[in-house]
């Protein structure tokens, strides 16, 4: 309960709202991609955890590094739940990375190009590219972990 008391109450409430928004956005994206209903809760949880990890690490790191770390958590949880629920990892991964995808960066890059502010367009575009590369590298990293690790962690020791 101390988490919600004192001067940190506003920060705590903001974090809870952001977590909730990320969960809802992730579930909406899962709905768009026709993920089976029984996985909506886990998809939302993965997206929310990814966003909170991003926000926490953004306090100390740059956006690309924060995105990389948060997406490692998203991919790890996606693989773990995929083994646990015996379904493809993409069920959780595609919707789980939704809060971390640099959509605003792409928008602002295009906006600055259209308004002929090429310096800002270059800066935004390069940052967006770094975030996109961070997402790809984090996916590659976690997919290098052996499948047996996820079987052990999920308590699912049978080969499928």
Segment roles from a protein language model:
Residues 3-76, 80-83, 87-89, 108-160:
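Alpha-helical transmembrane segments and their membrane-interface boundaries
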Residues 99-105:
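Proline-centric
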């Amino acid at each position: 309960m101390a988490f919600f008391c004192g001067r940190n109450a506003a920060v705590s409430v903001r974090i809870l709202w952001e977590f909730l928004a990320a969960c809802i956005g992730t579930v909406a994206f899962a709905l768009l991609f026709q993920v089976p209903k029984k996985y909506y809760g886990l998809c939302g949880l993965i997206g929310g955890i990814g966003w909170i990890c991003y926000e926490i690490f953004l306090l100390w790191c740059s956006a690309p590094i924060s995105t990389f770390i948060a997406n490692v958590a998203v991919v790890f949880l996606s693989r773990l739940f995929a083994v646990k629920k015996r379904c493809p990892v993409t069920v959780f991964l595609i919707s789980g990375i939704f809060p971390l995808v640099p959509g605003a960066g792409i928008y602002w890059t295009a906006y600055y190009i259209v308004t002929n502010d090429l310096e800002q367009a270059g800066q935004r575009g390069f940052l967006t590219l770094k975030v996109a590369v961070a997402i790809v590298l984090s996916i590659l990293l976690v997919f290098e972990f052996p499948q047996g690790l996820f079987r052990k962690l999920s308590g699912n020791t049978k080969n499928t």
